[in-house]
């Protein structure tokens, strides 16, 4: 095998390995980003629920006092 064909084969092999690594990183990063967005939405909803519950409890306590 000549040196040129050896270099071509090794470059092709390294290129495919690199592409697979990059694809897996991008895919994992995308899923991580989506999960973090979902978590932030859930946290925001929990905070809203807590505030609504506090407001509702205050409203009930005011009615009980009357």
From Swiss-Prot:
State the organism of origin: Bacillus subtilis (strain 168)
* Upper taxonomic lineage: Bacteria, Bacillati, Bacillota, Bacilli, Bacillales
Q: Write the protein's name.
A: SPbeta prophage-derived uncharacterized protein YopM
């Amino acid at each position: 095998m000549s040196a040129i064909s050896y270099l071509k084969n090794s470059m092709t092999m390294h290129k495919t390995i690199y592409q697979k690594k990059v694809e897996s990183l991008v895919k994992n990063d995308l899923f991580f980003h989506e999960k973090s967005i979902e978590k932030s939405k859930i946290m925001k909803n929990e905070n809203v629920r807590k505030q609504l519950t506090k407001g509702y409890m205050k409203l009930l306590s005011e009615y009980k006092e009357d």
